Design a protein with these regions (language model features):
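Conserved phosphate- and dinucleotide-binding cores of soluble alpha/beta proteins
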Residues: 12, 16-149
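Short, small-residue-biased leader/transition segments that mark boundaries at the very start
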Residues: 2-7
Length: 149
């Protein structure tokens, strides 16, 4: 909701909940959906069709969540359908990961995006100074947002 003049943008998503949230804005953006195979666990479209659709576009920014953050490896997930996340990162000029600080250190088996694919991490103020420095040392800009009660 804090995206400013989002109505001036084109937004592509594979998530119905994101699409519905964008539709509720007073001035909604041009909205594109990936299509693909519905995954009830992630409540999003996945698979080869979605990947093919994404490959035909070029995006300025990718905003993506993460199930886990591994200081050594990057973002991690339980979801084995991580091909779409990787394609999204490939077709975007800037990859911005949004994840709460408590996701750091979760031991999750699947590497989603290595730090070398990520330009910015937006997290909360609970991220320790040590973790902040270690992630920035990997070439990632880290933004700590203030937590609201």
């Amino acid at each position: 909701r804090g995206l400013g003049d989002v109505y001036k943008r084109q937004v592509m998503t594979n998530s119905l909940s994101v699409a519905n949230a964008l539709r509720e804005l007073e001035r909604e953006p041009v909205l594109l959906m990936t299509g693909g195979t519905w995954d009830p666990h992630s409540e999003s479209f996945q698979g080869q069709v979605a990947e093919q659709v994404l490959r035909s576009y070029d995006f300025d920014q990718l905003f993506i969540g993460a199930t886990g953050l591994d200081i050594e490896r990057g973002t991690t997930t339980f979801n084995e359908l991580l091909g779409l996340s990787r394609v999204m990162a490939e077709v975007a000029r800037e990859v911005i990961v949004m994840a709460e600080a408590d996701k750091l250190g979760r031991r999750i088996p699947n590497l989603e995006l290595p730090w070398s694919s990520v330009q910015t991490l937006i997290t909360d103020e609970r991220l320790s100074d040590e973790a902040f420095e270690l992630i920035q040392a990997r070439g990632v800009k880290v933004i700590r947002a203030r937590c609201e009660d």
